[in-house]
Each structure stands twice: as structure tokens, then as C-alpha cells.
Amino acid sequence: AQAAATLAAVLIGHGIIMENGERLLNDDVLNGTVVMILFTCIISSVVTERAARKMVTQENLMEGSEGKEQERILIPVANPETIEGLVGMALMMRHPKQKESLVALSVINDNNTSETKELIGKRNLERTAMIAAAADASVKTVLRYDLNIAQGIIHTQKEYAVTDIVIGLHRKTNLMDSFFGTMTENLLKGTNRQIMIAKLLMPVNTLRRIVVAVPDKAEYEKGFLKWMTQLCRMGKQLGCRVHFFATEDTLKHLRALTEKQEANTFTEFSLLEEWDDLLLLTGHVNYCLLYTSDAADDKA
């Protein structure tokens, strides 16, 4: 608006011809004004972008230093084979001082209820509570009826103020099935909480390295500090190394944050120039796939 007003004033002055035949504002003034406006517009956009990035990173640091958020991790249980792994994952990523931060959920489809399904759901919840108790942690068990599993998880997340959700990776049943499955996709669309999707092929406590592929500019997303802290927390709990792969700019933020807040974590940093190179990391990953999503933004 200021640039437009300045240009309009100069154009008016340029159009005024005095008695001696000269313009009130000559061509040099007009050209200088145009160059000045062009220069300031370019510089201001660059300065604004840099300032916005600094503000975002500073907000992330303040968010982590304040630590006011009460963690509550939701563990939907349906497959008995994955319960132990999901509970172990939740125990590793939770804050050690928050003993009552776990919520286990079993959802029964309201349109297809039966005593058998209710009994299976209760058994899964009982087993979840036993596994958590063995690690000196308490878990609140919830059995609920809903239209579908995704809606049941979303409603429970709202009712219990859940901050994180840990679920197992969908198992494809046919060629037309998507990678994440309908339930997970609906869950990603319906909630703005951090979701960890894990496929564990061996017990969590036997892991010796955590490989993290980070997309470009992930440091400017709201949940960046949170999931980075939780992965480093898992690394400290397991006594294993956390290996980050990211672009050069993102690696700078990761190094700075880990040195400041996670100095006791064993970390490595490697350059990942293009996201298409993600398949090159498969040689580093043998036993675990962990996918993290926060709100509408995805991170691996």
C-alpha cells in the first residue's frame, strides 16, 4: 500500500508541467522511485521470510522449554500380536515422570456387536494393563462402541485430551488396498494429534539403532521439537544411537536442538539430499518401521 501511494504521488508530480516547460518531478526521480520500490519489495520479502523462520524455531524452543503439556498417549488395541510392541513403544516415548499417561482403547463396531467381540476387547485391554504394570506404569482402559474404529479413536482422543496416538501399521489384504489402509487414512484426516504408526518385527527393547528420515523444512512445523524429543527419549531409554537423515538446513536445526536439549543421547547426522533417496536408507533399517504424523503435516 505504501509503495502504491508513493508511486501514485510520483506519477502525479511527473505529470505536472511547470511554466518553464519542465516537469515537477523529472524522469530521474520517477526512475529512481521505481528502482527503490523494486529493491525494497525484494529485500522486505527476504527479510520477512528469515524473520518468520526464526520466530517459528524460537517458538518451538520455548514450547519445549516450558514443558507445560500433560502427555497422554492413546494405544488402540485390536490385534493381540501387536499389543506388547505398541505398549513398549508408548512406554519408551512417554515422559518418565508422568506415570499415568497411558490410555488403552478397544473399539467395537456399533453396527456389528456381539458378546464374543466384547470379550475379546476386554481381554486385550487386560493384557495391555498387565504389560504396563510389569513396567511399573498404570494404564486407563477404555472399551467403547462406535460407528467405526477411526471414529472411536477420534472421540476418545477428544474425551481424554490425548496428545499422542500409537497404532500398528495396516496389513494389506489385497492389491487394491492402500499402504496405510482406510482406518489409518480416516484417522489422519480426522485428528490433529501426533500419530505414530509402527510395524515391529522384534521386541522394542532389543533395538540398537533408530534411523530417522526427516523431510525438508520439517523444522518449521509445529510438532518438530516434540517428535524429535520423543525419539531421542526412546534412544536414551534403549541405550541406542539415533541416526538422523535430512537436508543440510534441517540437519543444522537437529544438531542445535540435540546439543541443547538432548546432549545425553547418542546421535548421528547424515545428509539426505532428495526425499526420493529415501529407498537408499532401507539398508539401515532391518526390524522396525515407524511413521510419525502430526496434524496435516507428515514426517517420517
Model-assigned labels for residue ranges:
Residues 1-75, 81, 120, 167, ...:
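Membrane-interfacial segments at transmembrane helix termini in multi-pass membrane proteins
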Residues 2, 39, 135, 191, ...:
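Single, functionally critical "micro-switch" positions that shape active/binding sites
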Residues 6, 184, 297:
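Short, flexible micro-motifs
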Residues 45-46, 186, 194, 295-296:
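Proline-centered helix-kink/hinge sites
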Residues 68-281:
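Structured cytosolic domains appended to multi-pass membrane proteins
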Residues 161-162, 285-289:
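Short acidic/histidine-rich motifs immediately flanking catalytic phosphotransfer sites
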Residues 291-300:
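Conserved small/polar residues in nucleotide/adenosyl-binding loops
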